[in-house]
Amino acid sequence: MGKIIGIDLGTTNSCVAILDGDTARVIENAEGDRTTPSIIAYADDGEILVGQPAKRQAITNPKNTLFAIKRLIGRRFEDEEVQRDLKIMPYAIAKADNGDAWVEVKGKKMAPPQISAEVLKKMKKTAEDYLGEPVTEAVITVPAYFNDAQRQATKDAGRIAGLDVKRIINEPTAAAFAYGVNKVKGERKVAVYDLGGGTFDISIIEIDEVEGETTFEVLATNGNTHLGGEDFDNRVINYLVDEFKREQGIDLRNDQLALQRLKDAAEKAKIELSSAQQTDVNLPYITADATGPKHMNIKVTRAKLESLVEDMVKDSLEPVRTALKDSGLAVGEIDDVILVGGQTRMPMVQKTVAEFFGKEPRKDVNPDEAVAMGAAIQGAVLSGEKTDVLLLDVTPLSLGIETMGSVMTALIEKNTTIPTKKSQVFSTAEDNQSAVTIHVLQGERKRASDNKSLGQFNLEGIRPAQRGLPQIEVTFDIDANGILHVSAKDKETNKEQKITIQASSGLSDEEIERMVREAEANAAEDKKFEELVQTRNQADGLVHSVRKQITEAGDALPADDKTKIETALSELEAVIKGDDKAVIEAKQQALLEASQKLMEIAQQQSQAQGAGADANQSSSSSKADDDVVDAEFEEVKDDKK
């Protein structure tokens, strides 16, 4: 069996590693570098350049040189982050037919997985050159906070590159592998702070070594998949543009060639300021006007850089606090802090993290290489080459379906260990309903519309019956890659429908963070809404029950009582969709009081029909009601099919 290679597919740089004996080894590429720029360029002669060759020609070919594609993978064109990138990227971001964010090069639209596949191909070739044999299998890393669409798109990129992606593994977890395998003795609680080129993750991981076997259990994870070194670079670029405009009166934002040179200079300045107190950005002939050529010469100090990015560094601590809270650990219980990602080389980031955790981060983990090394270890575990490592990872967000009253009913809670499978029985909301719509959601809010819709599908052919009787079993299955599969089955007919959430219905990072943030900020509002929905559902059930009893009572119900009940019914139905819980409860009580005579008649009729047979029927009905959860499923009309 061939080697399963480990690939860190990064926003700025990528890296490939293998397990050599008992040690993970990073492989140098054809240029002799241990990391490869995640840059792809399309030359005029049709040649596709990847890595350093693409980066070298970027200044003269800005529109056809693609970088930071990971920020687009699995995203919708309308996403706020994509719209923001649209204004600063020198290449064209286009809207695909399915609404995804694609790029346009030389008049041709291309999907992000298609472009990322070019980087993966280079990683594959790098490994093949080193091993002297074909490589067909890989473990690829993704940010822990990547959603279902982004994970699926990453897997697609691997497939396009000719790789069988055996596992998608979270970047902080992979870094913990690189740190913990063969090194940790006993039990350690570790915080992995991963600030890369385009994404930020924090994972709290418990590493437990017993008799040579090491278990890695992710206790909680959080992050921001649109915060990274690229954003730091953009702050520097904007500062340089503003300074140049102030000095020369020329705005460079519309000059793609100048912007590409600025990007290169900003990145270099940022890196230099990690070891120096100041640097000069010197770009001769940056532009020209009627008076002649213009040159840029701007001094940037470390203090200035820190003032430009201070808010982003502070923002990174919010997900850290959330992850700690979700893990049930206090800051003082963290034994080790590991820094991953090139941006963590910035002294301000290191100082901020050290002050937060009250301890210096470890220096024995290479922030650029640890993730690929961990992926290689996972590859060796999957191939059976390494048997003394166990990984227990988690899903970052809750997953569920929309149920009666537009409520999000979670089947799998956030930070649940994966792979996992969970089933729950739901039922119909209307009598004789022949079809239901399963609406899959991702997020932390109670109101369905406040969460992200991942997709929906219909289950048809349900046997006509009273509402609440059909039993629809909904199953959520998250595989080890964190990718979701949903199925619904009518337990009586065994008819089943399945769906794998596709990248076209991806969830944007901003939406994820907004959902979690709002869930915490609006906990009281969520509880109030949940109580309102419960009251509405109770009222709806009462209306249904009373109408049925009126029909069954027939002429036995006096006309005066019937009129009172009909009036109370109308008044309750008029307020049932409103937002005032107290009003609904009052009208509900009024209907109960008006229905006293009706209930007496119903009881008399029930006794007359024979206690024995009715008791059995009642017991059966009660059991069915206990086993199901009312769900809001729309009946699929013929004109919708």
Swiss-Prot record:
Looking up Pfam families in the UniProt record yields:
HSP70
- Top-rank taxon, per record: Bacteria
This protein's UniProt keywords: ATP-binding, Chaperone, Nucleotide-binding, Phosphoprotein, Stress response
Q: For the region Disordered, what residue ranges are annotated?
A: 600-641
Q: Is this entry keyworded Glycoprotein?
A: no
Task: Kindly give the PROSITE patterns that the UniProt entry links to this protein.
Answer: HSP70_1, HSP70_2, HSP70_3
Bias category Low complexity: which stretches? Answer: 602-622
**At what positions is Phosphothreonine found?**
T199
Composition bias type Acidic residues, residue spans: 627-641
Q: What induces it?
A: By stress conditions e.g. heat shock.
Q: Which Gene3D superfamilies does the entry mention? A: 1.20.1270.10, 3.30.420.40, Actin, Chain A, domain 4 (3.90.640.10), Substrate Binding Domain Of DNAk, Chain A, domain 1 (2.60.34.10)
Q: Which SUPFAM superfamilies match?
A: Actin-like ATPase domain (SSF53067), Heat shock protein 70kD (HSP70), C-terminal subdomain (SSF100934), Heat shock protein 70kD (HSP70), peptide-binding domain (SSF100920)
Which GO molecular function annotation, any one, does this entry have?
A: unfolded protein binding
What this protein is reported to do is described as: Acts as a chaperone.
NCBIfam families annotated for this entry? PRK00290.1, PRK05183.1, prok_dnaK
Family assignment?
Answer: Belongs to the heat shock protein 70 family.
Q: Which protein, by its recorded name, is this?
A: Chaperone protein DnaK
Q: Which organism is it from?
A: Aeromonas salmonicida (strain A449)
The taxonomy runs: Bacteria, Pseudomonadati, Pseudomonadota, Gammaproteobacteria, Aeromonadales
> What gene name is listed for this protein?
dnaK
